[in-house]
């Protein structure tokens, strides 16, 4: 009797698809199985590689567009190879689990990290003599050492300390306030950024643990992606990513490479501006956001692969 009940139960779960032929029986239809597991949006190595575009559209100046090849390295031990699992975990944790959310998240993160080539901003500059082209000096960007780090380039004392709080870390409030005030002072007075700058760790007696927290955002892959998740959550990027994505086909004349096409949408602009340019979220002219054309190249690839 028990066997007959078990057999009836098993038969109820099985079905002959008919369409696949050879008389096979399936406990779960393979197409339904694949469809269900695709919803988790866990990217394989090959899927992530497909999202990285082969070329970028860079604006070198006003109406000066360059069509340039992207060098993407994802060999064993590379940054792209090592960080992929951490990116997937961060996306699962923060519910970046729909194709359009992934497109908005990765469209920004892939571009900001130089196509998954580095987790920190290029903060070191070189000044050359305009006549001889000899190196005059090398210097750090004015907001050093609080320059961009991580998958979405956490930048400035305010954002770092907000991230530390997001992670439940405790720090002296007076140090945070001093650094934020100094950053704001320099931001408002361009002429003194390099002549009257007081953001250094030494001058502000920054504790070693805070320095480690900050530096780990670029050196630790978990921190690099966790900080991006913080941006996603705290800047409400999902709200904009979930809006309707009405794609605009953009055609531009490039130098030496003729006409090239890329796609953009107001939803992607708003999700990007929420982190990088909050005051311009509703700007329908797509102006003011650094590298937006390049971001659109990654966004378009993600849309093509994931939807």
Residue ranges: model-predicted function:
Residues 1-136, 169-171, 175-176, 192, ...:
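Cell-wall glycan-active module
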Residues 144-210:
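A structural motif
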Residues 148-150, 215, 235-236, 291:
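Glycine-centered flexibility motif
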Residues 211-219:
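Active-site rim elements
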